[in-house]
A protein has these predicted regions:
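Conserved alpha/beta-hydrolase
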Residues: 140-147
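Short, well-ordered beta-to-alpha junction loops that form the rim of enzyme active sites
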Residues: 100, 147-148
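Conserved small/polar residues in nucleotide/adenosyl-binding loops
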Residues: 175-177
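Chitinase-like catalytic core of GlcNAc-active glycosidases
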Residues: 168-172
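Charged, often glycine-rich, active-site loop that binds/positions anionic groups
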Residues: 153-165
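Flexible, membrane-associating and regulatory peripheral segments of lipid-active enzymes
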Residues: 2-135
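Short acidic/His/Gly/Ser-rich catalytic and metal-binding motifs that mark active-site loops
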Residues: 104-108, 151-156
Length: 177
């Protein structure tokens, strides 16, 4: 019985070592298999010139209120004084923040904007904004748009579809404020 157990342990060790070797040799190919969409690129309809007047296309902008993820602050620890910036010394400035790609779905090359977008990408984008845009809370205005971000796999391939997806993410999201 002990011999069978040792054979099993040896088999598991060999399997882990073989898996690690395969991963080291083929990690780029494995990332492409896992993240690059296999679907054809379908061009997205350009946004209207005034599309960003709609508050639904913004994660953060003046007037959103307490649900603004870019204005998030961690809770104060008990007994710690609240840090309040002196408004008279702080210069007025605005921050325009474009969050990194949060769309990991292989279903399409670009994240949808219609019907609230991809729920998982929206959740991740809000986390990114809390962590990356909230340090700019001293700004008088923080603007963070929703955009047709390219899927993560578009950055991992040399295929023309990937380039088209990246171009669509940034070229079609021109913002006229």
């Amino acid at each position: 019985m002990a011999r069978k157990f040792l054979y099993f342990v040896a088999f598991c060790i060999v399997l882990v070592i073989a898996g690690r070797i395969v991963y080291e040799l083929f990690q780029e190919e494995l990332a492409e298999i896992a993240l690059v969409p296999s679907a054809e690129f379908s061009p997205v309809k350009p946004l209207e010139a005034n599309a960003y007047e709609d508050s639904k296309l913004w994660y953060s902008r003046p007037g959103i209120g307490v649900k603004d993820p870019a204005r998030w602050q961690p809770p104060l620890t008990e007994g710690a004084p609240a840090a309040t910036p002196d408004a008279t010394k702080a210069p007025r400035f605005a921050v325009f923040f474009v969050h990194p790609t949060s769309y990991l779905n292989r279903a399409s090359w670009n994240a949808p904007l219609e019907n609230g977008g991809d729920p998982e990408a929206e959740r991740i984008a809000r986390i990114y904004l809390r962590g990356m845009a909230s340090p700019f809370n001293a700004a008088s205005e923080i603007w963070a748009p929703r955009y047709r971000q390219a899927t993560m796999g578009a950055f991992l391939t040399d295929a023309t579809e990937g380039k088209k997806a990246i171009d669509a993410a940034y070229a079609l999201s021109l913002i006229h404020i």
